[in-house]
């Protein structure tokens, strides 16, 4: 299988959050109790039960509020710093040739904060037991020829999925 990638085109994102819901549903992640903080943004951050979220940036421009959206999730780096940070426990975090960066059961032997600190995007999260969580790119779906749940759910075309060279070409074309 070719290396696969997700392309995020923020210019097409309407912040409907269907990607968040699809991720929670597919991965059977529990709902989080949140409070209204005066923003449309919810939940407030990634967590052990929120692996994908839309972050809102509110900017005032010409007297009006512009909402800018950023999809926060694991970037499934070409050379993942989290994999390098986990080298003391071989196989704890792997970069699958198909694209996903996957955390295995062996990761329980790692210091979760060290793994989070290694990520330049501050993505991995951990629970009270120290177990590490992050977007898996729906590796179980991808390895069976399906799109990640978030991409399948995106009705605006903000999320695209395919072979990495095709996604890079699509990104270049849209710039």
Per-region residue spans from a language model:
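Non-ligating segments of multi-cofactor redox enzymes
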Residues: 1-175
